[in-house]
Amino acid sequence: MPKYLLLKHYSGGPEPHHPFPPLDQWAPEDVEAHFAFLRNVGEVLRESGEYVDSQALTPAQTWVRYGGPDAAPVTTDGPLPETTDLVAGWYMVDVDSRERALEIAAYISSEPGPGGGPLHEWIDVREIMSHAPVAD
């Protein structure tokens, strides 16, 4: 069965979605409802045997790249003002088909936001490579 990484994007995606304030500005009951929904998604996926893992991510980030053979790694802390995207978390699922991964992603996108309405967050659906690509 193929595995997929479902990346939850707080902002970004192919087109703008409904703007919401950052999570730390939500009412406590909205935060609890949001995370209760996400915990329930994990429980449902465990029961179906499709759950591999999931994590929420903090907004703080550090970018790093190779600095060269005799140089330290180059790092930049963020989030950066010019960065328009923030990955808020992810689920990894092991499913029968891409269609099932899309179905799960669409459901996750309905997670409640401020006031209880759906966030309509973009979910980036990426298949996990099962083997290295072969050059022609």
Where are the regions that the model predicts?
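Conserved, structured core segments of small domains
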Residues: 1-136
